[in-house]
Amino acid sequence: MENFFLEETSKTPKLSFDVSTGKFLMSGRSIPENSIEFYKPLLEWLDEYIKKPCAKTEFDIKLEYFNTSSSKCLVEIFRRLEKIKGAEVVINWFYEEDDEDMQESGEDFKELIDIPIIMSVIEN
């Protein structure tokens, strides 16, 4: 299985998923014209990854902003990760200390999913 990588643009986040280490990174802004189409290749890739995951899967989220349709796609990503059995899965949610919206979003996701989300402040 190959790694998954998409370069960041002004409207889409960087997506870097290393299958050999289980380290995943999503960073930047997520406001694509069509979130479902943008995230579809990643969701398909995750469907394959969860069949043979690493012993530990660590997903770092460092988003500056995301729109409502992107949040629905994030839930879909998290639902895929919930399907990983027999391996550790952790989501690290990074937010700037003065960004209450991103902090609240991370807290909201903690309520929705069955994966530990570790909240981490990025100090300015």
Question: Where are the predicted features?
Answer:
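A short, well-ordered alpha-helical element
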Residues: 12-15, 31-56
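N-terminal amphipathic/basic leader segments beginning at the initiator methionine
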Residues: 1-17
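A general structural motif
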Residues: 21, 54-58, 86-90
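A generic structural motif
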Residues: 117-124
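Amphipathic alpha-helical interaction surfaces in cytosolic regulatory modules
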Residues: 42, 61-109
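Short, histidine-centered active-site or binding-site loop motifs used for metal coordination
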Residues: 28-30, 63
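Short, aliphatic-rich beta-strand segments
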Residues: 22-28
